[in-house]
Structure formats: structure tokens, C-alpha cells
């Protein structure tokens, strides 16, 4: 899935839907994602826990380079105790957000 982002030389807004599996609930993962988005800058969206133990992220970035960095950092795990074993990344389309925050 990694090549989707780097190969699409997106002009303008890039939107992706990610589902993170692993040790991603109860370890500050959602807040880590929000902090990461703010640190990188130019990223807005939402993050929430799913009932199946995964975390879902809708993210939009000003460029594919910014999005690629965001995805790379999420794969590493945005908090010390989180561990992402699998990250599904797909190009997506959803209403634009003006900020990045936890949805639940």
C-alpha cells in the first residue's frame, strides 16, 4: 500500500483512509496521531477507535510529500507504547475538515 501515496503526484489536497492494527487502543494512540498531525503541519482529519480494536484515521494533507511523512510516522507508532502491526492505507474521498481531532 505504500506506493499509492508516493506514486500519485497529487496536485492539491490528498485524502486517505487508514486503519491501524496492533497495540493501538489504550496507549494514547489517537492523541499521538493528533499531535503528529500538528507537528508535521498541513494535515487535517479525524481519528477514532473502532469496536474491533483497530483505530481509523481520515487524513487530508496539502501535498503527497506531507501525507507520506505522516503515514511513515504512524507506521512507526506515534506514542512510545503503541505498536502498529499493520496499517491499511487507501485513497479516499470525504468532506474536508478544518482541523485534526479525536472523533470519539
Predicted region positions:
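Intrinsically disordered, low-complexity, mixed-charge
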Residues: 3-104
Amino acid at each position: 500500500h505504500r506506493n499509492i501515496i508516493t506514486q500519485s503526484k497529487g496536485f492539491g489536497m490528498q485524502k486517505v483512509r487508514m486503519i491501524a492494527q496492533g497495540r493501538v487502543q489504550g496507549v494514547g494512540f489517537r492523541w499521538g496521531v493528533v499531535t503528529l498531525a500538528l507537528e508535521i503541519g498541513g494535515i487535517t482529519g479525524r481519528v477514532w477507535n473502532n469496536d474491533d480494536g483497530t483505530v481509523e484515521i481520515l487524513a487530508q494533507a496539502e501535498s503527497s510529500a506531507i501525507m507520506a511523512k505522516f503515514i511513515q510516522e504512524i507506521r512507526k507508532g506515534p506514542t512510545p507504547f503503541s505498536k502498529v502491526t499493520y496499517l491499511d492505507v487507501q485513497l479516499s474521498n470525504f468532506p474536508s475538515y478544518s482541523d485534526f481531532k479525536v472523533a470519539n
